Amino acid sequence: MIQTKEDLRLYLEKDKQALGITRKRPCLVGDDIWKFEIALRYHEYLTNVNGGGVTRLIRRKFWGFLHHYFGIRLGFSIPINVFDYGLRINHYGTIVVNTKARIGKWCDIHACVNIGESLDKKAPCLGDNCWIGPGAKLFGGITIGNGVMIGAGSVVNKSFTENNITIVGVPARKIKDTGDPY
């Protein structure tokens, strides 16, 4: 969670790095995914930090509006305080994430992904360096290890706590060890 201005700067820089962007600020036209991530991070920061009075309230409402606006425009339903830094959203398109989900650093997510809770009201927890392919569905109180690659169209409804593996299928199953990329 973003608690300080230093955290906010770190998150913004790492998100920009994950998107492969070298410019200082977004273009007036385009860069909508980057603009969404900036609005998401400012909204997180202003929601998590107490104090500031009316000015902070107005700023929080403004960034909350931008977060919501870009989310609707791009098809994203990504709540605050779910993703750690290094979020990379690859394409416009439907991405739905439950507010209870927790996703680690350097997550790479594609279009048409759904990360939701199950009937028992538990949501997924993903480790760092995860890659989630287009159309993947993750639900329930599952835990996914670090460096896991989830194939396109996979349905993940059980935990995979091993690190650096590839899982695919309906329901998902491990197909290989990918090795540590670092």
Segment roles from a protein language model:
Residues R73-N81:
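Charged/polar, low-hydrophobicity segments characteristic of intrinsically disordered regions
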Residues M1-L74, D180-Y182:
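Terminal amphipathic alpha-helical/low-complexity segments used for targeting or macromolecular assembly
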Residues I80, Y85-G86, N90-T99, G104-K105, ...:
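Left-handed beta-helix
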